[in-house]
Amino acid sequence: MEMLQGLLLLMLLSMGGTWASKEPLRPRCRPINATLAVEKEGCPVCITVNTTICAGYCPTMTRVLQSVLPPLPQVVCTYRDVRFESIWLPGCPRGVDPVVSYAVALSCHCGLCRRSTSDCGGPKDHPLTCDHPQLPGLLFL
């Protein structure tokens, strides 16, 4: 009888999280709001823009016997559908194109990171800040 009670208790405890909330414990991969610093070499200003980026949890696995078997591909939260918007930087000298484009995430998914189009993570040497004086982002095209 004690074994049956223990099994029932284990089942109830393991299902408790599903009753408490329908949301996952970790936020899944999805578009989120973000503020980016936009600047261009040759232009004396930096403008912040509000956009959406892909962020969130993607389930991954790793092998226990890594030396025997090849590594499993690791997935990251990355863009599925994206559009590009442009902003005009004031004060750029003649000969420097003042238009800068940036991505706006429309939808995201868990997939392999494409280094050709994405920052695949890892530690950063410096925070994402401006090198030039900052202006509010008011100059959209």
UniProtKB/Swiss-Prot annotation:
Disulfide linkage: C29-C77, C43-C92, C46-C130, C54-C108, C58-C110, C113-C120
Annotated InterPro entries: Cystine-knot_cytokine, Glyco_hormone_CN, Gonadotropin_bsu, Gonadotropin_bsu_CS
Transmembrane regions: none
Cellular component aspect of the GO annotation: cytoplasm; extracellular space
Highest rank taxon of the organism: Eukaryota
Subcellular location field: Secreted
Gene3D superfamilies for this protein: Cystine-knot cytokines
Function of the protein: Promotes spermatogenesis and ovulation by stimulating the testes and ovaries to synthesize steroids.
Family assignment from sequence similarity: Belongs to the glycoprotein hormones subunit beta family.
Name the UniProt record assigns to this protein: Lutropin subunit beta
Organism of provenance: Pongo pygmaeus
